[in-house]
Amino acid sequence: MNSKESPFQFEKADDSSGFLLWQVTNLWQRGIKKALEKHELTHSQFVLLASVHWLTLAKQSVTQVLLSSHTKIDPMSTSTVLRSLQEKGLLKRQEHETDTRAKTVSLTDKGITLVNQAVKTVEQYDDEFFSPLAKESKDFNKKLVALLSRKLESE
């Protein structure tokens, strides 16, 4: 596309990293959504459940603020999703022992059972989806972390 009227800097759409990332993200999210249907979880619910479990296994005191920071989900959405998970009996939210403004989050036995099953499902899907990267996946992940780090520094 070399027209003087064109606002695009790229000859082909496939030369645009942003457009490619958008396409890949949509494709991946559609697959994740389908994979999680059998667990009756949305992607956000899964990410928060898995993060509570991950942080708990790392011996961290899990708060809503920590979860929001860890997942990059805004605090209001984090609170809304956690409330829905609490209503499903998958987690508990309690007053923090020392900070009365904070809430700690922990999984119930039902939540632990479900997240263990769902993690296997998602990891199987990820393995299949990202298999074309094969040996390059570690380098790919490092580049994604670099993009995340750069974005966080500018905020």
Regions picked out by a protein language model, each given a short descriptive name:
Residues M1-F10, K59, K135-E155:
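C-terminal regulatory/oligomerization modules of transcriptional regulators
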Residues K33, E37, S68, I112, ...:
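Solvent-exposed, non-membrane alpha-helical residues enriched in polar/charged side chains
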Residues S3-K4, R83-K142:
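Charged, amphipathic alpha-helical coiled-coil/dimerization segments
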Residues Q64, L82-R83:
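Short, hydrophobic-biased segments on the C-terminal half of alpha helices
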Residues R30-D74:
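N-terminal helix-turn-helix DNA-binding core of bacterial DNA-binding proteins
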Residues M1-H39:
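N-terminal leader segment of winged-helix/HTH proteins
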